[in-house]
């Protein structure tokens, strides 16, 4: 987004020139990027068009590459995360994954919306509400339209794209857009940096637990970023009044920390039980094991460190 914000003038000039040259579609794009035009209806139309384009693009990608199945990259990352599972890391990463739940994100979103309405920042409140509504509509619609087999340990409530990653990207990303405009110079990078770290941690934690495929996480980030680019540029183009960001920044980050501290410890056990790594049991008949059944069994420990891949020299029938 910062790259787009830096080059916004040139990009917007080209967009407006294209809009004037193409009056049929241009009247909608001009309304989004022209500060003298109202934006509610054009933004809704753009959101619908963006939703349709994204659906067609990802449906085409899945049909061509995956034929409706997880990609090879998804399977590889899933197996890698299963190999990395460690009891010492399970609880901290389950707590991090819980930060993407609605119990942690909903209070923050509602408090920011209430604060903006209380301060009569209707432009910011409208964009904030549009960001949340489109994110929820996007994930719900795509989850019902795109059918991809889920990881083995996942319940029916999870799918493509990851709603936790999508909403985390939208909420933290658009809040960074709101406050970065008021920060001086190089300090504007900090809200974006914090947003990226939080979303990356939530996405990695959910990959580690096996809650999503890698394509679910990347898809959630991608759709969130696309909507941020459109809505963020439209907001920055129209917003002319400055406001004091310290109260709302304390409110946003402070309430997120409090909600996370309240929800994560209570959700760790449930999440670990829900995404418990499946134990693969294999039995071999004694007679088959004596003849040739022992040969396919692993000859070394399954370790990433070659020094610890010790040979398994002894087999015991029991």
Pin down the residues of each PLM region.
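Membrane-interface loops
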Residues: 64-82, 89, 103-196
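Alpha-helical transmembrane segments of multipass membrane proteins
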Residues: 54, 135, 139, 202, ...
